[in-house]
From Swiss-Prot:
This is Leucine-rich repeat transmembrane neuronal protein 1. Belongs to the LRRTM family. Residues 314-365 form the LRRCT domain. LRR repeats lie at residues 64-87, 89-111, 112-135, 136-159, 161-183, 184-207, 209-231, 233-255, 256-278, 280-302. Its main location: membrane. Residues 35-426 are extracellular. It comes from the Eukaryota. The lineage of its organism: Eukaryota, Metazoa, Chordata, Craniata, Vertebrata. It comes from Bos taurus (Bovine). SMART domains: LRR_TYP.
Length: 521
């Protein structure tokens, strides 16, 4: 069909006057994409891509057209003026990072409708007008990190329905306007970390139905309310580490699909008992380096899907309230840091939480109740693998409140059987170590005998020679001791034919020893 239409057009053109044909051909050539102009000096051209990087440029090259990509990074640009890129209507990406840009006029990106990626990071931009990104409705990625932005215009991201990635890390942003991301329905990654946020509005993140990862670390937030993240149904990762959060609450009863939450390095002292019931699919939780002293049993019961948790660096109170946490850790099948140290009372400071529970018998029957919790004995400890013996159960004493009453938590204490098992384990381990050492020595000797037989023969001869020398020395010492005794020895040689009176094992002789006599001089 296309060839048929082309043939009809050619046939029609051939019947027309030559002037009309030339005009039509000129119009067609004008509609074709313009080829890129000559490559500017010191720049690098790759087809329709232009790289003018690290050239100390103070303004963008002129008379550019037909480009698909332009990189002006690592230069000295200080301002983006209105209509500066009007000749680049086919541009799809623009890199302006690592310059000295401090001013961006509202219509600086006019006629750049096809741009999908814009990088303005590592500059000195202090503000952006509402109309800055209006000419670029096809943007997929915007990087504004490492600038000096202090405030965001309420409609800065209006109309960016295709935006998927937004970086605003390391600025000086103090507040996120309400519904500023309302039109960013395709946004999946948002980074506002390393700013100066002190609080969040309830609808700051409204409209982000496809957001999967949100970074708010290293800000100045003092309170986290899960109601600030309404209907983020696709959110899987939330990073809030290194803020100043003291309490974590949830004022809305709704469930979301969060799988990873980082609250480490804050100042958390209190968490509402029901706060984690809104995230039933949570798998990874970081709570290390906070000010927690204990964890409510209801919170522990809501950590059913966790596979990884960090709790070190908190101010754990190893009193009777620690029993619930100790029981939960004993049954936890996932990964945890295992460095939970007691901060109080004084006699348990520096001790591991689980060791303190067992060593100081913190959860035994007869302990006094504290903080509205009651300790009672339980005889069944098969779940923890210990023999039947004393144990304790932690239960909330509030009645008539089914939503806030936790399930009983059992803490098992090891008895004599457990101590005997530990001793047996030590003995077996020591025996195995000795056997292993002996086998290693035998193996070394065998390998040496196989690989260096001559050396072993020489070594054995040396040992034999040393033994002979030692025996000779002993014999000489004995003879010297015998010669020192003053004995009168009388001997009579045998004059038998063939007998020789020769000493030193060459003949035979007979000796008669007479009693010792005193001689007068």
């Amino acid at each position: 069909m296309d060839f048929l239409l082309l043939g009809l057009c050619l046939h029609w053109l051939l019947r027309r006057p030559s002037g009309v044909v030339l005009c039509l051909l000129g119009a067609c050539f004008q509609m074709l994409p313009a080829a890129p102009s000559g490559c500017p000096q010191l720049c690098r051209c790759e087809g329709r891509l232009l790289y003018c990087e690290a050239l100390n440029l103070t303004e963008a090259p002129h008379n550019l057209s037909g480009l698909l990509g332009l990189s002006l990074r690592y230069n000295s640009l200080s301002e983006l003026r209105a209509g500066q890129f009007t000749g680049l209507m086919q541009l799809t990406w623009l890199y302006l990072d690592h310059n000295h840009i401090c001013s961006v006029q509202g219509d600086a990106f006019q006629k750049l409708r096809r741009v999908k990626e814009l990088t303005l990071s590592s500059n000195q931009i202090t503000q952006l007008a509402n109309t800055t990104f209006r000419p670029m409705p096809n943007l997929r990625s915007v990087d504004l990190s490492y600038n000096k932005l202090q405030a965001l215009a309420p409609d800065l991201f209006h109309g960016l329905r295709k935006l998927t990635t937004l970086h605003m890390r390391a600025n000086a942003i103090q507040f996120v306007p309400v519904r500023i991301f309302q039109d960013c329905r395709s946004l999946k990654f948002l980074d506002i970390g390393y700013n100066q946020l002190k609080s969040l509005a309830r609808n700051s993140f409204a409209g982000l139905f496809k957001l999967t990862e949100l970074h708010l670390e290293h800000n100045d937030l003092v309170k986290v309310n899960f109601a600030h993240f309404p209907r983020l149904i696709s959110l899987h990762s939330l990073c809030l580490r290194r803020n100043k959060v003291a309490i974590v609450v949830s004022s809305l009863d709704w469930v979301w699909n969060l799988e990873k939450m980082d609250l480490s390095g804050n100042e958390i002292e209190y968490m509402e008992p029901h706060v984690f019931e809104t995230v039933p699919h949570l798998q990874s939780l970081q709570l290390d380096s906070n000010r927690l002293t204990y964890v409510e049993p209801r919170i522990l019961n809501s950590w059913k899907s966790l596979t990884s948790i960090t709790l070190a660096g908190n101010l754990w109170d190893c009193g009777r309230n620690v029993c619930a946490l100790a029981s939960w850790l004993s049954n936890f099948q996932g990964r945890y840091d295992g460095n939970l140290q007691c901060a109080s009372p004084e006699y348990a400071q520096g001790e591991d939480v689980l060791d303190a529970v067992y060593a100081f018998h913190l959860c035994e029957e007869g302990a006094e109740p504290t903080s509205g919790h009651l300790l009672s004995a339980v005889t069944n400890r098969s779940d923890l693998g210990f023999p039947a013996g004393p144990a304790t159960t932690l239960a909330d004493d509030r009645e008539g409140q089914p939503d806030s009453t936790p399930e009983p938590v059992t803490v098992a204490l090891p008895g004599e059987h457990a101590e005997n098992a530990v001793q047996i384990h030590k003995v077996v381990t020591g025996t195995m170590a000795l056997i292993f050492s002996f086998l290693i020595v035998v193996l070394v000797l065998y390998v040496s005998w196989k690989c260096f037989p001559a050396s072993l023969r020489q070594l054995r001869q040396c040992f034999v020679t040393q033994r002979r020398k030692q025996k000779q020395k002993q014999t000489m010492h004995q003879m010297a001791a015998m010669s020192a005794q003053e004995y009168y020895v009388d001997y009579k040689p045998n004059h038998i034919e063939g007998a020789l009176v020769i000493i030193n094992e060459y003949g035979s002789c007979t000796c008669h020893q007479q009693p010792a006599r005193e001689c007068e001089v």
